[in-house]
Amino acid sequence: MSVPDRKRALEAAIAYIEKQFGAGSIMSLGKHSSAHEISTIKTGALSLDLALGIGGVPKGRIVEIFGPESSGKTTLATHIVANAQKMGGVAAYIDAEHALDPNYAALIGANINDLMISQPDCGEDALSIAELLARSGAVDVIVIDSVAALVPKSELEGEIGDVHVGLQARMMSQALRKLTATLARTNTCAIFINQIREKIGVSFGNPETTTGGRALKFYSSIRIDIRRIGSIKGGENFDIGNRIKVKVAKNKLAPPFRTAEFDILFNEGISSAGCIIDLAVEKNIIDKKGSWFNYQDRKLGQGREAVREELKRNKELFHELERRIYESVQASQAPAAACVDSESREVAEAAK
C-alpha cells in the first residue's frame, strides 16, 4: 500500500471511530494538550517538590503515600490539601480512620470551613464517594485516609474471626479501574494514604508490604515512601518535631528513587523554612561555618533554629533564597537537557 493510500485509510478509520465513539475519541498525541501540560499541587516541602521532578503532586493522577505509624503521612496529605485550597481549589477528605484532627489541620493551614469531609462506614461507600466527587469535576484533590481502614461491607457484616481472603484487594482493584479514567478526565488528584505490614516467612529481601493488594501500586503514578529518621530537640532538650526522609518509590512523570529530607514540627507541620536552609546550604547559597549561617555579607544567625526563626520573620529573604534555589536547580538541569538534545540530533542525522 502506497503512502497516500495508507493516509486515506487512516483518515477513514479515524472518521469512523469519531462517528462511533464521539469527537475527540482519537487524536494525535501532540494535539492532546493535557498529555504534556501537567498541573501540580505543592507538597509544602520544597525538597520533596524538587525530588518529585515536576514541582509537586500531579493532578489527574493517583498518588500513594505509605510508611510506618507516626511518620507524617497525614501531615503531608493535609499540607497538599492546604496548598490546593490556597490555589483556589476545592479539597475533600475521606476519613475512613475517623481520626482527622480539625484543629491540627487548621494549624497546618487548611481551611476547615471549606474542606469537605466524609466518614463512611465501609470501603465500598468510601470509594464510591471518591468516584462521585471526581466525576463532578469540581474537586481538585481527594484524600483517602487510609487504605487499611477501607473495610469491605461483607467483612463488616460478618463476625470477628471470619476469614475473607483477598476481599479488600478485589474491592480496590474494581474501584481503581473506574476511578483512574475519571480522575484523568476531570484533572483531579487522588491521594491514598497507606500503612505497611510485614510479610511472614520472608528470609531475604524487604519483608514490608502495603495493604490493599497490588492494584494501587500499579495504578499509582507516584508512590511516596515516608519515614521518621530522627527527632528535633528544642529548649531544655524536649522534642519539638521529627526529621523525615522521603523516597519516591515510583514516578511515571520524572526519574524515580530520588530522596528528600525535611522537618515536621509539632506546632506547625512541615517546616518550609527548614527546607530552604537545607537546600541553600547544599547549593552553596548559604555559607555554613561551624554553627554560624551566612548569606552574602550578612550573618543570619547561630544555630539552625535561630536561622529558621529569622526566615519565618523575614519573608522577603525567604522568597529570595527560594528563587535562588530554583535558579540553581534549573542551571544544573540545563547541561543534561542540552546533552540529550545533541544525542537526539546525532541519532536523527544518522537515520538520514
UniProtKB/Swiss-Prot annotation:
Compartments, as annotated in UniProt: Cytoplasm
Source organism superkingdom: Bacteria
UniProt keyword Chloroplast, yes or no: no
Keywords: ATP-binding, Cytoplasm, DNA damage, DNA recombination, DNA repair, DNA-binding, Nucleotide-binding, SOS response
Biological process according to GO: DNA recombination; DNA repair; SOS response
Record-listed ATP binding positions: 67-74
GO cellular component: cytosol
Location (main, coarse): cytoplasm
GO MF term (any one): ATP-dependent DNA damage sensor activity
Matches recorded under Pfam families: RecA (PF00154), RecA_C (PF21096)
Family membership noted in the UniProt record: Belongs to the RecA family.
Entry-linked PANTHER family: MITOCHONDRIAL DNA REPAIR PROTEIN RECA HOMOLOG-RELATED, RECA
UniProt function note: Can catalyze the hydrolysis of ATP in the presence of single-stranded DNA, the ATP-dependent uptake of single-stranded DNA by duplex DNA, and the ATP-dependent hybridization of homologous single-stranded DNAs. It interacts with LexA causing its activation and leading to its autocatalytic cleavage.
Record-given protein name: Protein RecA
Organism: Chlamydia trachomatis serovar L2 (strain ATCC VR-902B / DSM 19102 / 434/Bu)
Gene assigned in the entry: recA
